[in-house]
Amino acid sequence: MHTTYNYSPNFELKKRKPDQIKFIIFHYTGMKKESEAIERLTSIKSRVSCHYLIKNNGEIVVMVPDLYEAWHAGVSSWKNFKSLNKNSIGIEISNPGHELSLIHI
């Protein structure tokens, strides 16, 4: 397994404690080109990030170190947890998504 680093500027600067991490949240990029997804995840203008990106070739890209809060879950909650960015590791899977709009599902 090959790992590279391409750090995103989009994360909370205050470190969290390892025991604060309770969840792993998987997302897919939903973009046709992997390079566009990487550009978005590393652009300060986008204000989104993840801890890890799994590329199409299986390579893992580290974007935010685990002890920092990446901006991947937005306004979120699960059971008694609110703002899941604080308590989770965000993993993006490079994937263009689907051709259907959500209206048709």
What are these regions (language model features)?
Residues 1-82:
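N-terminal catalytic cores of peptidoglycan-degrading enzymes
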Residues 50, 87-89:
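Generic beta-strand structural signal
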Residues 69, 89-101:
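Cell-envelope and extracellular/periplasmic
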Residues 103-105:
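Conserved small/polar residues in nucleotide/adenosyl-binding loops
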